C-alpha cells in the first residue's frame, strides 16, 4: 500500500514538473515576433525602459512581450540599456531577443557610400543611415587635428571613403 502511494505522489510530481517546464518553455522560448519577416528595432542613447517596450510592442506577441518584461525586471535591464539596431527574426524567443539587446549584439547595417564630390554631401548621406549627426561628422572630416591623427589632411581625407557597400554597426 505504501509503495502504491509513493508511486502515485512521484507520478503526480513528475507530471507537475513536466507541465511547469512546458509553460516556461512556451513563455520564454516560443516565437517572440508575430511577423513572418525580420524586423529591426533601433535603441537610441536617450531611450529608457518604457520607450524600449513601446518600440518592441508592435512586433511582439502578447506572451513574448510579457516574458521580455519579466526578464528585464529580474535582470535589471533598465540600468544596462545598450544603443544599437537589433534584429528580431521569426522564431526567436523572448529570451533570445532579450539576450541580444542586453549584450549589445547588434545586426549590421549595409552602408552604401555614394560617389559624391563634397564632404558635406558625404556627411549627409552617411548620417541618414547611421546614428550620427551630419554636422558633427562634417566637422570631424574637415578638422585639421582629426585628419592629422589619421595621417591625412583635409584635402586627402576623402580618399578614405571609397564608394562601395560596407557592413557597419548602427551606432
Regions found by a protein language model. Give the residues of each.
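Conserved catalytic or metal-liganding residues and their short signature motifs at active sites
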Residues: 1-171
Amino acid at each position: 500500500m505504501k509503495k502504491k502511494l509513493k508511486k502515485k505522489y512521484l507520478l503526480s510530481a513528475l507530471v507537475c514538473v513536466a507541465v511547469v517546464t512546458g509553460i516556461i518553455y512556451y513563455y520564454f522560448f516560443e516565437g517572440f515576433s508575430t511577423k513572418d519577416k525580420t524586423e529591426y528595432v533601433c535603441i537610441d542613447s536617450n531611450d529608457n525602459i518604457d520607450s524600449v517596450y513601446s518600440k518592441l510592442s508592435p512586433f511582439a506577441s502578447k506572451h513574448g512581450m510579457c516574458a521580455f518584461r519579466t526578464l528585464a525586471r529580474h535582470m535589471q535591464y533598465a540600468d544596462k540599456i545598450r544603443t544599437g539596431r537589433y534584429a528580431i527574426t521569426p522564431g526567436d524567443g523572448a529570451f533570445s531577443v532579450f539576450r541580444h539587446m542586453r549584450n549589445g549584439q547588434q545586426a549590421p547595417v549595409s552602408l552604401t557610400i555614394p560617389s559624391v564630390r563634397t564632404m558635406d554631401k558625404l556627411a549627409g548621406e552617411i548620417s541618414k543611415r547611421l546614428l550620427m549627426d551630419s554636422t558633427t561628422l562634417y566637422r570631424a572630416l574637415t578638422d585639421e587635428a582629426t585628419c592629422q591623427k589619421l595621417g591625412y589632411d583635409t584635402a586627402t581625407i576623402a580618399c578614405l571613403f571609397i564608394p562601395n557597400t560596407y557592413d557597419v554597426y548602427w551606432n
